[in-house]
Regions:
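Arg/Lys-rich, low-complexity, intrinsically disordered basic segments
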Residues: 1-97
Length: 97
């Protein structure tokens, strides 16, 4: 499956992910437009708090790369400090191109 990340066309969201698998196309918008994430502030304590807060309800979905919560968790709040590396890491984690 191929993944393309770009700026969101949704006024309230930060990024858009388009998953292409043959003729099937899935579009997901994710990340709050005005929000600050680990990619922005690089604050490990805030990242830890975000993960703890969201994993209680979202962890069961983290195996589905097309879910907005998974995209946010591993791209905006992952281990990388810049967007390009975060996307590359995400693609590797979920075997996407």
């Amino acid at each position: 499956m191929k993944l393309i990340i770009s700026n969101s066309t949704n006024k309230n969201k930060r990024l858009k992910a388009v998953f292409i698998d043959g003729n099937k196309k899935i579009t997901r918008h994710f990340g709050f437009k005005g929000g600050s994430t680990y990619i922005d502030h690089k604050d490990k304590e805030k990242r830890k708090n975000y993960r703890k807060r969201h994993e209680a309800t979202e962890k069961k979905f983290y195996t589905d790369p097309t879910r907005p919560s998974t995209l946010s968790r591993f791209i905006l709040w992952g281990n990388e400090t810049n967007l390009r590396d975060a996307i590359k890491s995400y693609k590797n984690k979920f075997n996407l191109s």
